[in-house]
Amino acid sequence: PMLVALLLASGLAPARPPLRQLAAPAPADAKARVLLAMRGGEARMSAAQAFGLYAPAMGVLTSNALYFSALPAVLAARNSGDLGPFNPLPSTIMIHSVFGWLCYGLAVSNPWIVASNLPGAGAVLATFAVMLPLMGNSHPALSACQLTFVGGAMATLCLWTGLVFAKVAARATLVGYFASAIFVVLAASPLSTIRTVLSTRDSASIYTPLTLAQCANTLLWTVYGVAAAKDVFVYGPNGIGLCLGLVQLLLKLVFPTRKR
């Protein structure tokens, strides 16, 4: 289903810029001023131009760091044969989130969004493929992960089936809503173990690299969305994700992971 969605995204991109195009093409003289400022010339880059260039460029790195963050832990768990306190639900949701954003980036022809999700797509698929056998038949999150994977795939198929009958101008908007909703669920998913964290006063189930990557990534994309792109599909879900990431970080500080 993910491959079908990507093929449709590339084919359904509207001939004219969509209603929510992230960044209108800059005039030639504006581009020249930006290049001159970057090379140390006399022209000065405005704050909006700086945010529009550096924030998404760094966001490409932090987005992929977010998607790659769980892979080392899962590979280490494969060697030991046990996932331990690792929460597998966020890694499952990441599959649908990365493909949702990748489809949105293709639909609105935004290279920043495509670059920030394309490498991560391989990482989340590898993480899930390694993680699933380690869960066995007795892992408490097995049913939730299976339901999330199948349910997300069916939701993606239903979305793209509906887009065939939607107007061209509405397609990018609908994909944006879909990707945003999944990302908010992803950002909140580490808190699925909050009851365990509070009862045991141990935040081991909240994976620190994922939390740090989420905070850095959502901060950069929120700044880019507000200052440069002015796109609610960028700053909306990322702003919510930043707040949820800070909650996770607070729990990590209040209830440190116990040494094992």
Predicted regions span which residues?
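Soluble extramembrane regions of membrane proteins in the secretory/endomembrane system
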Residues: 24-28, 36
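N-terminal chloroplast transit peptides
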Residues: 1-24
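Alpha-helical membrane-protein topology signature
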Residues: 34-260
